[in-house]
Amino acid sequence: MAVASSTRPSQKQSTSKLQPWIQLTRVRKFAGTMVLFWPFAWGLTMAARALLLPVQTFGTILACGFFASCLLHSAGCIWNDILDQDFDRQVERTKSRPIASGAISNTGALIFMFAHLFILMGMIWTSNSLAWMIGIISIFPLPGIYPLMKRITYWPQAWLGIALNTGIVMAWAYTTGTYPTSSIVLSVGAWAWTIYYDTIYACQDKKDDINAGVKSTALLFGSYIKPVLSLFGSIIVGSLLISGILNNQELPYFLVSVGGGGLHLATQLWQVDLDTPKSCWNAFHSTAFNFGAIVWAGLLLDYAWAVGVGAIM
């Protein structure tokens, strides 16, 4: 008993030292990983259906994509916190973040971030030239520039929409060495989806952002947020419809992904209170998990329909 009790303080101390690093990577806030992963999963499943990709190959690539999404999300959060630390100290929701609070130094954060990036580069090292190029762009310039956009434009979400959704064309490029028109159309919808959910997310901090000088579509759209977001919702559903037609998707996709996804967005936009931070967070969390899953479920059912349910089971 004496040995066990003597180890408890050191265990607690080790855990407390790890907490800032865990907080820095946002591994406990999985919604950010999912909004990176879903576009890749959508693109891959569309490609798998078109190519009749073997289930084992599909599953392996999907798992790698999920792991890469976890790493890229964490690296992006670290970089964002390094650049935004002065802003974060002025916003109630973010002032306790590890870099803003001084729990982690800039040097330590940079080393940690580059460790993530080196693993990501290793994962795409043997891919074809197009997938390699898209992967490098997805890892470095696109997410790297995003935090700066909040300083110079009220449309940072538009840039974020490009940065977070390259997974669609990446999935096609990795499996086929090219990307079809359907993947571009779906990417437009995913871009609109990012503006949709990140505008809702930004509504949590509207008052603090005004004081800190942070720009966002939540401030730009003002009292017209819901009408504007309904327009972006229409773009999302329209792109799902058109990309499905171009990719020769069948009934399961149109019923679940297009119909179910559209119903989810409409219901969510009707219910969310954009002046209540908790309601905004719940809506963001819902679209990050539920909308993405609904769209993927339709794609997965259609893939099973194409290759034969027996192959999936």
Curated annotation (Swiss-Prot):
Changing residue 84 to A: Completely loses the catalytic activity. The keyword Magnesium does not apply. A motif (DxxxD) lies at residues 205-209. Mg(2+) binds at residues 84, 88, 205, 209. Pfam families: UbiA. One of its GO terms (cellular component) is mitochondrial inner membrane. Gene3D superfamilies: UbiA prenyltransferase. A motif (NDxxDxxxD) lies at residues 81-88. The chain crosses the membrane at residues 30-52, 57-79, 99-121, 131-148, 155-177, 227-247, 250-270, 293-313. Keywords: Membrane, Transferase, Transmembrane, Transmembrane helix. The conserved residue His-73 is the gatekeeper residue for hydroquinone (HYQ) substrate preference. Prenyltransferase; part of the gene cluster that mediates the biosynthesis of clavilactone A, a meroterpenoid that features a unique benzo-fused ten-membered carbocyclic ring unit with an alpha,beta-epoxy-gamma-lactone moiety, forming an intriguing 10/5/3 tricyclic nested skeleton. ClaR, ClaS and ClaT are sufficient to produce clavilactone A. Within the pathway, claS acts as an atypical UbiA prenyltransferase that transfers geranyl pyrophosphate (GPP) to hydroquinone (HYQ) instead of p-hydroxybenzoic acid (PHB), producing the first intermediate geranylhydroquinone. This is UbiA prenyltransferase claS. It comes from Ampulloclitocybe clavipes. The gene is claS.
